[in-house]
Amino acid sequence: MVSHSELRKLFCSADAVCFDVDSTVIREEGIDELAKFCGVEAAVSEMTRRAMGGALPFKDALTQRLALIQPSRDQVQRLLAEHPPHLTPGIRELVSRLQERNVQVFLISGGFRSIVEHVAAKLNIPTTNVFANRLKFYFNGEYAGFDEMQPTAESGGKGKVIRFLKEKFHFKKIIMIGDGATDMEACPPADAFIGFGGNVIRQQVKDNAKWYITDFVELLGELEE
């Protein structure tokens, strides 16, 4: 059993930190915002809640929600232009501080790459450090499904990404930070998990995470000590 002080040391000596995006790096759930924009918010929000609570296999939840939303390429582009995602307070400073320490920062999301890349640009995170789901569109821009080959399209996908990062870059210590069950499941192979409840509290995560925070200032403080 890793103690809290050992977890803090792990975080401060990590060579890579992976963040979930929806309700962690940004305040919103991207798929819920897309559903709201497309007029099917209520049904999709309930599915998101069940998926994040671990009650529904992730790929099933994603397939069902997207079948309801049917987002076109134009709708995704207009969502980003008219309702860009809001960064969680403190995340810009935390990512910047980690990068100053030569820590590699990755975004691993069950959300959509087009939205996550927009967030990555705000945080000076290269697109090569983004792992997320890809929406597919027909030539006329209508919804054509999603890329089911992406590891993030299924339960356990975030762990697969972290395993891939360890094999590719030989990272010794990878930390996963996020609000949901799929984030907590990524440890192991992540060396430590930090639960985040600054935007929404998932009781299962709060009850089981050995380190649970509600403000990124706490992690910034650890790096400054």
UniProtKB/Swiss-Prot annotation:
Binding site for O-phospho-L-serine: M52, S109, G110, G111, K158, T182
The protein, known as: Phosphoserine phosphatase
Reaction it catalyzes: O-phospho-L-serine + H2O = L-serine + phosphate; O-phospho-D-serine + H2O = D-serine + phosphate
GO molecular function: L-phosphoserine phosphatase activity; magnesium ion binding; protein homodimerization activity
Assigned GO CC terms: cytosol
Cellular location(s): Cytoplasm, Cytosol
Enzyme Commission no: 3.1.3.3
Protein keywords: Acetylation, Amino-acid biosynthesis, Cytoplasm, Hydrolase, Magnesium, Metal-binding, Serine biosynthesis
Family label: Belongs to the HAD-like hydrolase superfamily. SerB family.
Residues annotated as the enzyme's active site: D20, D22
Keyword Metal-binding on entry: yes
